[in-house]
Amino acid sequence: VGTLKGKSFTAQFNRVDAGAGDNVFTYEGGKVDSWELSCAVDGLLTANLSMDFAKETIGAGAGVYAKATPTYPTSLVLLSFVGATVTIGGSAFDVTSASVKGDNGLKTDRYGIRATGTTKNEPLEADMREFTASFNAEFQSVAHAQRVAAATAAGALASVTLKWQTPDTLHSVQVDLPALRFDEGAVNIDGPGILDQAINCKALTPAAGGSPVTITVVTPDATA
């Protein structure tokens, strides 16, 4: 997890109107403010990005504003719940849904009074980054409730890995959270059905150092 200062991207969208006409929208100075990876039973792994841009330009032009031709990976695949595993403390844990979120803590409203040039400065980190995870599962044991109630920091932590993989193992996305603190693990009784447990956690920096979250993407493509 490094600094975001000086890092940005340009995105372009072609929005087709009711008359089947192309309308190019170009966005410059882009940064990801927050993100989420999530998946549930019967669903696909999805990524949701909240993005902030410095400038919007409508209409095709020259250079970066020219209508671009999109390119796609040669082996594009979808990852689903079928090839997913969640491991907590080294043991597999069956869940009905899982989510990992990241908030970069950016100040995106750095506006100033200026007669010339841009009136918005680059968004910078104005708060500590926060990484959280949540799981919904059938109530299987008191293990995670005990983590929430633990009297020591060590007792509340567990190493968690989430992995989505295709059957041929050529494509995968893996999220490693080496020091996940269990903050909530409510088990409520609302009827005669199987009890559910909602688990909410926060990723911490490991005591030995390193990143609180690592995302590894594997693909057979020579370039990603």
Residues covered by each model-derived region:
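Signature of extracytoplasmic/envelope-associated structural regions
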Residues: 1-224
